[in-house]
Amino acid sequence: MAASYEEERDIQKNYWIEHSADLTVEAMMLDSRASDLDKEERPEVLSLLPPYEGKSVLELGAGIGRFTGELAQKAGELIALDFIDNVIKKNESINGHYKNVKFMCADVTSPDLKITDGSLDLIFSNWLLMYLSDKEVELLAERMVGWIKVGGYIFFRESCFHQSGDSKRKSNPTHYREPRFYSKVFQECQTRDAAGNSFELSMIGCKCIGAYVKNKKNQNQICWIWQKVSSENDRGFQRFLDNVQYKSSGILRYERVFGQGFVSTGGLETTKEFVEKMNLKPGQKVLDVGCGIGGGDFYMAEKFDVHVVGIDLSVNMISFALERAIGLSCSVEFEVADCTTKHYPDNSFDVIYSRDTILHIQDKPALFRTFFKWLKPGGKVLISDYCRSPKTPSAEFSEYIKQRGYDLHDVQAYGQMLKDAGFTDVIAEDRTDQFMQVLKRELDRVEKEKEKFISDFSKEDYDDIVGGWKSKLERCASDEQKWGLFIANKN
């Protein structure tokens, strides 16, 4: 039975009174390696924040000030809030020389906490929501949306799934939730101002903390960035992916067809074949664009001892990828990100890998120029993607392309775009015959398991998959749809 509000607050307060007797970074992070982790993790977290120079910032669960001093150096004004008195006093003793900081002992769940609506540019919290009940998270999310200005941001970071720190604890009342809980609560949060205008939160980013992946092979440290927008704002393509093409049920359906961990053509079989062509070496860094639910990334990290960064625009895909990572202990980090707006430093990756994803991107030349910058000299790109015949598409095929929002090119034109972006040794292969063989095998498997498929999903799902696969085969047989494999180098 869920604890009452008073019981929940007492449990959490007593837990933190016990763990704040020793006011050190080890006590706050509940980890014996805290000092070393902090050196990598704190700069990483701060680097993820939107610009807040001269802005009004609220830090919830400020603790002894691990982030307070850093925030104070840039913020116009900062409120540092914590509900344990001796903890916030310690913070003030360390950071009180910053005259733009107000230190406050208060409980974020208390109705007595008064913050003016529309007064903040950024709300920052690090390990706070996991110490609140589900209902408290929902109520606080609503209040936070009210507190920030339109265009303002909310950043929070939480431990998901299970404990990360190695500190021994008599009891542990922490709520280690699935990331999809936080995504759902904040996505569904809507507020109205006095004039009746409606506002909601748009997800700007969601990723696991790289320092924990690198040092602990742990993907459960996850942060979110949200921006307050008018409810009329169109979230466009991301909403289409998560509500239409890649709904949670649809992803599981695709996974049944492609194999565990995969949502692209051929599953593990084609992954093994194509990854072999990249000549991966231990310690290399790979970017997977459109990583789906992570099967290819886990394979690369485990088999070749590389570090993989998987990005996907679909929140649902990344949620599944994070869940699949539990217990694998591999060097893979995941992020909800748009590859057309994402920024990485030049020369960041040894390999960029993308499977049946770039068909969604309208400006491929711009994306390939970006890939070229992100790759290190000597780096390699490998892409498989839907393509089309050079001839004029039929009305039916044109309608299919339009309905899916695809941007398709013929295989040679696709390869030329890579050359134009600066790549050399470009290989552009028409793999349509292989595509058709794989489609037939996948279709045959689904049809043989018809009763189980319908039992696990539905008759409608079965008909969608069978009809969709047969349509792909027909389009390929009529020389309209193609499948291309592209490999290129950066000298």
Curated annotation (Swiss-Prot):
Question: Species name for this entry?
Answer: Arabidopsis thaliana (Mouse-ear cress)
Tissue expression: Highly expressed in the meristem and elongation zones of the root. Expressed in differentiated root epidermal cells. Highly expressed in leaf vasculature.
Q: Which residues carry this modification: N-acetylalanine?
A: A2
The annotated pathway is: Phospholipid metabolism; phosphatidylcholine biosynthesis; phosphocholine from phosphoethanolamine: step 1/1
Which transformation does this protein catalyse, written as a reaction? phosphoethanolamine + S-adenosyl-L-methionine = N-methylethanolamine phosphate + S-adenosyl-L-homocysteine + H(+); N-methylethanolamine phosphate + S-adenosyl-L-methionine = N,N-dimethylethanolamine phosphate + S-adenosyl-L-homocysteine + H(+); N,N-dimethylethanolamine phosphate + S-adenosyl-L-methionine = phosphocholine + S-adenosyl-L-homocysteine + H(+)
User: Localized where?
Assistant: Cytoplasm
Binding positions (N-methylethanolamine phosphate):
Q245, Y246, Y254, Y386, Y400, R404, G405, Y406, K472
Q: Which family does it belong to?
A: Belongs to the class I-like SAM-binding methyltransferase superfamily. PEAMT family.
Q: What class of enzyme is it?
A: transferase
- Where is phosphocholine bound in this sequence? S159, S164, G165, R169, Y176, Y254, Y386, Y400, R404, Y406, K472
Q: Which residues form a coiled coil?
A: none
What domain of life? Eukaryota
Record's protein name: Phosphoethanolamine N-methyltransferase 1
